[in-house]
Design a protein with these regions (language model features):
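A detector for short, charged/polar N-terminal pre-domain segments
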Residues: 1-17
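Structured beta->alpha junctions
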Residues: 12-15, 47, 59
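Polyanion-binding surface elements
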Residues: 14-30
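Short, well-ordered coil↔helix boundary/capping segments
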Residues: 17, 37, 60-64
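C-terminal structural segments of small proteins and small subunits
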Residues: 57-80
Length: 80
């Protein structure tokens, strides 16, 4: 298992204790470069519907609900 996959596994196990920089690394890997607007990083997803993933820096940590959204989007992308 690679570094990115290990991070995703950690996100699944504990979405409340995720560093913003780690979440950005994972999102950059799966979804490409973000569009940054203010304090939000917005990533596009390749499917119809809600085609965005929105993450914010909360004092160096990522918000837990946003981490869960990223994990869900990665699973959808992988077809799991």
């Amino acid at each position: 298992m690679g570094f990115i996959e290990n991070l995703v596994q950690q996100f699944e196990n504990n979405p409340r204790n995720v560093g913003f920089a780690d979440l950005c690394k994972v999102c950059n890997h799966y979804f490409g470069k973000p569009r940054t607007k203010g304090s939000h990083n917005v990533y596009k997803t390749p499917w119809q519907g809600d085609p965005r993933i929105n993450i914010q820096n909360d004092n160096g940590k990522a918000k837990a609900y946003q981490v869960r959204q990223v994990v869900k989007a990665i699973k959808k992308l992988q077809g799991v």
